[in-house]
Amino acid sequence: DHGFGKGRSGDVETLQRIGTKLGFGVDVVPPYDVDGEHVSSSRIRRLLEAGSIEEATHALGRPYSIRGRVAKGDGRGRQLGMPTANLELDDPHKLLPLPGIYAVTVGPVKGVMHLGPRPTFVGAGPTIEVHLFDFDQDIYHHTITVEVQAWIRGIEKFDTVDGLVAAMYADGRKAREIL
């Protein structure tokens, strides 16, 4: 069911003709089903955009991952008692899951991730911030791969910083329970 190009007018035969002309091969694989449902890139995109991480993981056969370089942020997480690794994506076109709070892993290290806007702070743009549990190493400028394990909650605006901090710690506890 593969289509590409304008109006998805390209098909397998088109790709095979292009391959012959340009010197590459095309292997057609049968459809892939999980639990009786067809797995496609469109289905994976819909699941991620809906925040259905566990279903996406099941369909992919592995956790969805986000890769990026750890950059300096504004230090707000550290000031609030929960330092974060701020990610600059390797691929600016990477499909990201629904904005929210997620339980994640980075290699063997467990953590919690905020992905999206920061409505509690006026003028604060969207970010991808990962707090790693029981981890205190300098990883600035390192590239890390964050495996998204589970959805915790959506983005919320808090009336006070204390309310935000309480939610951050509750999110951390929930992520630890999940992981």
Annotate each PLM feature.
Residues 1-2, 30, 150-152:
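Short, histidine-centered active-site or binding-site loop motifs used for metal coordination
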Residues 1-22:
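N-terminal Rossmann-like or analogous alpha/beta NTP/dinucleotide-binding catalytic cores
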Residues 73-179:
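Phosphate/ribose-recognition catalytic cores of enzymes acting on nucleotide-derived substrates
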Residues 17-116:
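Glycine-rich, Lys/Arg-enriched anion-binding loops that position phosphate/diphosphate groups
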